[in-house]
Amino acid sequence: KMTFTPHGKHLIAGEWVATERTFSSDPAHGPSHAFSVGTPALVDQAVRAAEDAFWSFGHARREDRAAFLNAIADEIEARADAITQIGTQETGLPEGRLQGERGRTVGQLRLFASHILAGDYLDSRHDPALPDRSPLPRPDMKMVQRPIGPVAVFGASNFPLAFSTAGGDTAA
């Protein structure tokens, strides 16, 4: 079994970025690993990269977006042992717990891909105005689901995959 060591950098726009300031942690076993401290400048850099990706990804064909999510799921499965090992080192969670979460994450990615292909996200509704409704008139109401751009996800460390890295909130 190979041993994987976290390198403690931030992944921003496909590049691994580090800062001079670090902190150390290994809640599972020790010895500690050094992790680069995030800065406001790195957050700004990540937000700009996410906005750039949003415009290209948001205008991609449905089939391409679904294929992208399925490819992420495939890569997570292909790197299952490494992801579990690093997740254990970073969080102290047991392997079985991370394996279950990894399966949930892959399932979420594939679920969102299937919703994209089916067009489920295109749901729109229109409730026409009822000016004579009593006791008050109802205005014309429309609901359209559309992407609005990147969101910040402050993920819980007790769900390092399913919520914070690749799962529900991120994939949605």
Q: Residue ranges of each PLM-predicted region?
A:
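N-terminal Rossmann-like NAD(P)+-binding subdomain of aldehyde/semialdehyde dehydrogenases
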Residues: 1-139
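Conserved small-residue-rich beta-alpha loop and adjacent elements
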Residues: 128-172
